[in-house]
């Protein structure tokens, strides 16, 4: 009976971590900060064309949000001295800044990602 309980707990742990990973993969993260003009432009663009997507805006000046940004920078091997906002994470891709090229990248990645609320 003890082994059955241990096995069930192991399976439950695996299932819960799989759920947590999939929910994280269903979000687009936009790291921004107050006063960032490019962040505002990115926000307005996403609100207009991608409002059905699960986009989470994260202000890097609040709480420990900067640590989350650093975690993604490390994951994508982005040097700290070249970080800026907006920094957008879409699945296994990231975008730094916001201009014509970044809009094209965002559109391409968003179509691949297809995460809706």
Which residues are covered by each model-predicted region?
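Solvent-exposed loop/turn segments at secondary-structure junctions
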Residues: 34-37, 60-65, 93-96, 101
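Positively charged n-region of N-terminal signal peptides that target proteins for export
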Residues: 1-7
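Thiol-based oxidoreductase modules, predominantly thioredoxin-like and allied folds used
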Residues: 54-71
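Non-catalytic, surface beta->alpha helical segment in thiol-disulfide oxidoreductase systems
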Residues: 89-117
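Structural micro-motif
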Residues: 70-91, 99
